[in-house]
Amino acid sequence: MKKLLIHTICLLSALTTSTAVAAPFTAGITALNRQHDATAFRAWKRIADLGDAEGQNNIAYLYERGMGVKQSYQNAKIWYELAAAQGLPEAKHNLAMLTYQGHINGRDTRKSVEWFREAADAGLIQSVYMLGVLYMEGEGVFKNYDKAFEQFIHAAKRGDARAQYMVGAIYAEGFIDPADEPDYAKAFLWSGLAVLGGGEQAQSLKIAASVYLEKDQEKQIVEQAAQCLKTNFEICE
């Protein structure tokens, strides 16, 4: 199986709640873009202390990375938990990543599954993808390739390039059912969509799949990919 790509932590760059904290939130984004990490931390700490979930998530991100403040997974956990308690999906995803990567009292994949599932249920595609990874690997859940594919295809149809790559890889290897033959046409389609979405790692898979296709098949699939994008993936399987 192709190497699984892992989604990293989520930093919020757009405010979704009260405009009362918009100025310091935006100031933090501007500072971070200019690599003024300590200034970003101070700006977000102000609104985090006022209970703003986005600010809490973002200073947790800085603690986790050691950007503008001394690196501390424990402090990152505290602030992520405060934001997650307010229902912020990104904070739940980030807590899941901390536990998945073993940064909080050892690796706890079952707890990761809980956080990823909550964030995925709230619509966070990064978490949908990560549930696919966990089902594929059998981490925190029983290994189940069908469920892994369900998560990957769902995220792929929402435009996630990593998920599109994984869908292509699964089709290329006939991974769902050992009795199935590889479907190189679908592998070419989804890896091509991943490349269009910025997933450079999918280029090698696209090339490998193309070896098994005729030129007229490739042309038809390229046209199908265009229709997939035009219809927001409604016609893609």
Task: Describe each model-derived feature in a short phrase.
Residues H36, D49-A53, R65-M67, S72, ...:
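Short helix-capping/linker turns of helical repeat alpha-solenoids
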Residues H7-T16:
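Bacterial N-terminal signal peptides
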Residues W44-I47, L82-A83, E118-A119, H154-A155, ...:
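Canonical positions in the second alpha-helix
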Residues P24-A31, N58-R65, N94-Q101, N105, ...:
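Hydrophobic face of amphipathic alpha-helices that form TPR/SEL1-like repeat modules
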Residues Q35-R42, K70-W79, N105-W115, F142-Q151, ...:
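Structural signature of tandem alpha-helical TPR/SEL1-like repeats
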